Amino acid sequence: MGQARTTGLRGMAEAVTRPDQILDIAAGQFRTKGYAAVSMRDIATEAGMRTPSLYYHFPSKDDLVMAVMDRGIVVVREAVMAALDDLPPDAATVTRLDTAMRAHLRALHGASDYTSANVRIFGQLPEAWRRANMPERRAYQAIWSALLAPTCAADPAVLPMRVAFVIGALNATLEWVDPARIDIEALADQVTQVLRHGVLGEGAA
């Protein structure tokens, strides 16, 4: 959000022609204030543009919200996939899980507001919008299903619950971590240890 506010005619022209900047600002506002408390005027003001100019890029708040929501999943999915791609093909299950959990946490608590905005406001959205975001969510859940399947070999029926639990536990760190004092690597150490040894047990070895 460091490039959020611009001033003068040149800055306003840049804001009007940069949808990505608008999305950055919207994601930051949704993350900090929630869905209902954010208006198109709020976003336009922070972007240094007039509200009608904002509607040129995003015809409604619905369009803006859904763009932020979809990007929130894409950001974390790409982060996890990139981290996994860096591992050797024969990496152990526990190594792949540890890598994926760390990548998820870095995306969630890192510089981008998109993933944390998605997590925070998903439950605040109308049901139709939640359904619209589900294809992206299912694509991401499929990655975790593949990662966690070896830990459920003895009872495959528990796999969906285990996927939901792990993703939910990672996302829940938004609720109890102080963003002003966060050390992402220390957090990753703590959370991955708990999930690997307390939840996944010997099946993750």
Go through each PLM region and give its residues.
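Helix-turn-helix
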Residues: 18-21, 25, 29-63, 67
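Hydrophobic alpha-helical connector segments
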Residues: 67, 81-110
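N-terminal intrinsically disordered/low-complexity leader segments
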Residues: 1-17, 28, 87, 203-205
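Short secondary-structure transition hinges
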Residues: 105-145, 175-177
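Short hydrophobic clusters on alpha-helical segments that form packing/core surfaces
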Residues: 22-30, 72, 104, 195
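Hydrophobic alpha-helical segments that form the core
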Residues: 102-105, 156-177, 185-198
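Short helix-capping/turn signature of helix-turn-helix
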Residues: 55-58, 119-125, 168
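Amphipathic alpha-helical packing segments from all-alpha helical-bundle domains
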Residues: 74-81, 127-152, 160-164, 189
